[in-house]
């Protein structure tokens, strides 16, 4: 056993010696790394684009009996508030069919811009102030305040401010089910679509729209009448996306002639749900379920 151990030890020592000789004869390879170079990179900020839906769309001509006739009446004034704190009120800044406004960024920051449009409408069949904010074009959105019954007229103002054609899918949700329609919009095209051409005598409806690839501007114009008397006009932008919690800021009505405010709720899901409404007034709090 001692002899065998000595033989194994001798072989191991010889192998170690030979490995040292081979290692010593191998060329030495050195690795070098490039010295890092610091460079300043400037990122061009994306411009902020807003779109104003434009002036009042009159359906059926001034008399209301001209089939298929839709005219944009007058001009809507545009007011801008810049991120620098400057308010721009230019009497020459108006639009009829809609306008795209762009705020170019600076110092790697997107420019800030807030824009509204307003128009006083005075026609035989329409009277009132039509005003709204100007929003960013969107790929999809909701409206839940639609009305298309007797004495109520709703017109969709569709605009494609992009450089590509798109297909807009409209889904009207009425108490009896769903009604769909598709509208093709070329680049830069604006179209006024009377809702009465799609649905008929629906006092309450919701609308979901979605495009095939580029964002568009959609606004809902409403006109109300009582017999031969006009009751007012309105212009609305898409509602906020469905959420668990929503906050609606209060209003102070300082003039007679307005109808009482109505809260409209819409459950877009397939399961029933319960809504808890907390109304806060100056002197009390009311909770409804």
Where are these predicted regions, by residue range?
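Conserved functional hotspot residues at active sites or interaction interfaces
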Residues: 2-64, 115-159, 216-268
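Extracytoplasmic/periplasmic/luminal assembly and interaction segments
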Residues: 56-98
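Short beta-strand/loop motifs in extracellular/secreted proteins, especially
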Residues: 63, 74-77, 154, 164-169, ...
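Intrinsically disordered, low-complexity Pro/Gly/Ser/Thr-rich segments with frequent PxxP/GP/PP motifs
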Residues: 80-100, 175-206, 282-289
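Helix-biased "structured C-terminal domain" signature
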Residues: 86-98, 192, 235-237, 247-249, ...
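Short, aromatic- and glycine-rich surface loops/edge beta-strands on solvent-exposed regions
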Residues: 98-118, 203-213
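Short acidic, flexible loop segments centered on an aromatic residue
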Residues: 155-179, 265-286
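Short, surface-exposed polybasic-aromatic patches that bind anionic ligands, especially phosphate groups
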Residues: 182, 194-197, 201-203, 207-208, ...
């Amino acid at each position: 056993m001692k002899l065998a151990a000595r033989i194994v030890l001798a072989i191991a020592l010889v192998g170690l010696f030979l490995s040292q000789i081979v290692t010593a004869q191998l060329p030495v390879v050195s690795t070098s790394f490039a010295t890092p170079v610091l460079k300043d990179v400037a990122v061009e900020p994306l411009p902020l684009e807003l779109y104003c839906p434009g002036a009042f769309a009159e359906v059926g001509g001034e008399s209301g009996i001209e089939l298929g006739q839709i005219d944009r009446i007058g001009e809507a004034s545009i007011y801008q508030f810049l991120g620098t704190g400057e308010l721009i009120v230019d009497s020459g800044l108006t639009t009829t069919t809609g306008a795209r406004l762009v705020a170019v960024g600076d110092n790697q920051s997107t420019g800030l811009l807030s824009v509204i449009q307003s128009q006083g409408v005075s026609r035989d069949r329409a009277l009132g102030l039509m005003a709204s904010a100007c929003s960013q074009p969107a790929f999809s959105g909701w409206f839940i305040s639609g009305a298309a019954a007797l004495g109520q007229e709703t017109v969709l103002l569709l605009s494609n401010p992009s450089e590509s054609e798109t297909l807009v899918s409209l889904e009207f949700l009425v108490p009896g089910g769903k009604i769909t329609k598709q509208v093709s919009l070329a680049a830069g095209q604006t179209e006024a679509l009377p809702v009465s051409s799609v649905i008929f005598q629906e006092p309450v409806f919701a609308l979901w729209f979605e495009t095939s690839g580029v964002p568009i501007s959609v606004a809902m114009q409403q006109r109300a009448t009582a017999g031969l008397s006009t009751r007012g006009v309105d212009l609305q932008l898409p509602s906020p996306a469905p959420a668990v919690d929503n906050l609606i800021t209060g209003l102070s009505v300082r003039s007679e002639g307005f109808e009482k405010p109505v809260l409209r709720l819409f459950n877009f899901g397939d399961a029933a749900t319960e809504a808890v409404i907390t109304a806060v007034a100056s002197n009390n709090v009311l909770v409804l379920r």
